């Protein structure tokens, strides 16, 4: 089987990760003790992608839980599915990273990283055919961002040919935990650009807007935000967990989605959006799902896809529906909005259909877009970074852990390069290539 090793780091990563395991355990008919109570063979057919089978027919998540302080992991352990995880896979320190990237990446995190890698290695060795790793973390704090990126580069060193996939929660001005988030995020992006194959950018601002506008929640809690994230993660991983007509694994997804190695930051979306409390589900049609899925309001990253163009798109539909209708609707969207898709990648929209819908819904759709509009997110962080860095504000917290200002400058310019690369491909057209070829032909003729 093609296994995935899941790692969750830091407070945010552990909270999102715990929700993810709750939702997919439910979808696979696995209860909080790891026992199977399902009703369909499909639930078990690819169960090994995320679960190990233990003695007594129990299913145990192939998850490694990491943090530099014990608090969050205690709450995961005492949470609804806390007993399903393997106790040895909780790896934590006592000191905390204090929202300081340098502590997570260079000092405190570096001390803990080897014991984490031991657990990761153990999980990887028991795999039949490991396809890759997925990490849930945030970029604004200290542990998820600093130690998370340290883990990525160490795992990359040891497993260079395996796919590395991250679900990264990007800080936003509206929902800010700490003032140094722009520093931590920029230093993290600097690492992610080089060391991951696929990164799903999840943005608290976008999640807040969805909860507030669409779901009509007056005071959204982190629980509500994390619920949205876990819906999206469940949708994105559907193809990996269930047999379907278009069976994706992490590598196939990367091949379809990443036209240039650095441009691997995706914008996820989900439809239909219904709040946790509201159970009045109406029967949705495929056209409505398709329409909603491409809507800017449904994006989990606070970027407007209409401000950029899609390089590639993957859509995953779930539920019993006609493939023909799905294909027609997807073509319809592309034809009506052709200016928003780059014309130099033909057939850049891929669609998969899985028969098993998420709990409580007849059908749903998950959207993964590689859009040049994601540059808005990096620009936003970069502006905040520059404002502080120009005055060297808060730098002593980082240099005190042995970091050099040079590293900040490098991270800043790497992120600005990333923005320019997205911009370059946003403006590129197919005719430029034609002109270029004509010029070359002209040169050949002259010679």
Swiss-Prot record:
Annotated positions of the Phosphoserine modification: 40, 339
Domain of life of the native organism: Eukaryota
Subcellular location: Cytoplasm, Cytoskeleton
Binding site for Mg(2+): 69
Binding site for GTP: 11, 69, 138, 142-144, 204, 226
Example of a GO biological process term: microtubule cytoskeleton organization
Database matches in Gene3D superfamilies: Helix hairpin bin, Tubulin/FtsZ, C-terminal domain, Tubulin/FtsZ, GTPase domain
Keyword Repressor: no
Cofactor dependence: Mg(2+)
A single GO cellular-component term on record: microtubule
Keywords tagged on the record: Cytoplasm, Cytoskeleton, GTP-binding, Magnesium, Metal-binding, Microtubule, Nucleotide-binding, Phosphoprotein
Region (Disordered): 427-447
Residue ranges with Acidic residues bias: 429-447
Record note on disruption phenotype: RNAi-mediated knockdown eliminates microtubules in fat body cells, resulting in defective nuclear positioning.
Gene Ontology terms, MF aspect: GTP binding; GTPase activity; metal ion binding; structural constituent of cytoskeleton
PANTHER family: TUBULIN (PTHR11588)
Function: Tubulin is the major constituent of microtubules, a cylinder consisting of laterally associated linear protofilaments composed of alpha- and beta-tubulin heterodimers. Microtubules grow by the addition of GTP-tubulin dimers to the microtubule end, where a stabilizing cap forms. Below the cap, tubulin dimers are in GDP-bound state, owing to GTPase activity of alpha-tubulin.
Oligomer and partners: Dimer of alpha and beta chains. A typical microtubule is a hollow water-filled tube with an outer diameter of 25 nm and an inner diameter of 15 nM. Alpha-beta heterodimers associate head-to-tail to form protofilaments running lengthwise along the microtubule wall with the beta-tubulin subunit facing the microtubule plus end conferring a structural polarity. Microtubules usually have 13 protofilaments but different protofilament numbers can be found in some organisms and specialized cells. Interacts with mgr and Vhl.
Family indicated by similarity: Belongs to the tubulin family.
Protein name according to UniProt: Tubulin beta-1 chain
Gene: betaTub56D
């Amino acid at each position: 089987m093609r296994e995935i090793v899941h790692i969750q780091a830091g407070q945010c990563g552990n909270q999102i990760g715990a929700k993810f395991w709750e939702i997919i355990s439910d979808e696979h008919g696995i209860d909080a003790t790891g026992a199977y109570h399902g009703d369909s063979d499909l639930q078990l057919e690819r169960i090994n992608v995320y679960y190990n089978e233990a003695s007594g027919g129990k299913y145990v998540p192939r998850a490694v839980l990491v943090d530099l302080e014990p608090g969050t992991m205690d709450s995961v352990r005492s949470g609804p599915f806390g007993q399903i995880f393997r106790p040895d896979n909780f790896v934590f320190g006592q000191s905390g990273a204090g929202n300081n990237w340098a502590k997570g990446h260079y000092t405190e995190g570096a001390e803990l990283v080897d014991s984490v890698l031991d657990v990761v290695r153990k999980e990887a060795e028991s795999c039949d055919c490991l396809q890759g790793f997925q990490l849930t973390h945030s970029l604004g704090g200290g542990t998820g961002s600093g130690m998370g990126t340290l883990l990525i580069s160490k795992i990359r060193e040891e497993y260079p040919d395996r796919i590395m996939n991250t679900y990264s929660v990007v800080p936003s001005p509206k929902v800010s935990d700490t003032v140094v988030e722009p520093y931590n995020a920029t230093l993290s992006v600097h690492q992610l650009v080089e060391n991951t194959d696929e990164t799903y950018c999840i943005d608290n601002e976008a999640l807040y807007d969805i909860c507030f506008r669409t779901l009509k929640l007056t005071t959204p809690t982190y629980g509500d935000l994390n619920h949205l994230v876990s819906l999206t993660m469940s949708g994105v991983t559907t193809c990996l967990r269930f047999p379907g007509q278009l069976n994706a694994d992490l590598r196939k997804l990367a091949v379809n989605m990443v036209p240039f190695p650095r441009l691997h930051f995706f914008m996820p979306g989900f439809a239909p959006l219904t709040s946790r409390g509201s159970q009045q589900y109406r029967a949705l049609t495929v056209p409505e799902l398709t329409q909603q899925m491409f809507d800017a309001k449904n994006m989990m990253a606070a970027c407007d896809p209409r401000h950029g163009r899609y390089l590639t798109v993957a859509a995953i539909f779930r539920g019993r529906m006609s493939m023909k209708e799905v294909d027609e609707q997807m073509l319809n969207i592309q034809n009506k909005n052709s200016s928003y898709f780059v014309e130099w990648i033909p057939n850049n929209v891929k669609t998969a259909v899985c028969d098993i819908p998420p709990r409580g819904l007849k059908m749903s759709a998950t959207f993964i877009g590689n859009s040049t509009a994601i540059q808005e997110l990096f620009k936003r962080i970069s502006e905040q970074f520059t404002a502080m860095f120009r005055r060297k504000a808060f730098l002593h917290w980082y240099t005190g852990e042995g970091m050099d200002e040079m590293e900040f400058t490098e991270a800043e310019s790497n992120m600005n390069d990333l923005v320019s690369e997205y911009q370059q491909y946003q403006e590129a057209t197919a005719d430029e290539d034609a002109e270029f070829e004509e010029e070359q032909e002209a040169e050949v003729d002259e010679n």
